[in-house]
């Protein structure tokens, strides 16, 4: 799908505030409400806009620890990849999982209450997976930049 500058302007506004009204978008980009509504519907139907979410303050929800894990599987087979991905998709602590190139296979981002809670997750859920050969855990000391907004 080819996006023009109006589409990109609408997307920038929606990324910064998913609850922004069509009226406010109209005022911001100087376009009437009807074509804005039509463009948003088209962007949704084409899958450019996948869903609308609410970002939560994890610290206020007692999820103060962010951990990045580099996971290496014992064998790089299609079955191992599939089984690992299906299993970790069920763990709510894991908020991001990427299959990567390089010296490990997966890069995970997870949130937990504290180190003790992470240790329990590590020992009881992650390290016991039969296809996992190695896990390197990196504890976030400070988040310098965290955003879901894509550069448009």
Which ranges hold each PLM region?
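A compositional/biophysical signature of low hydrophobicity enriched in polar/charged and small residues
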Residues: 1-152
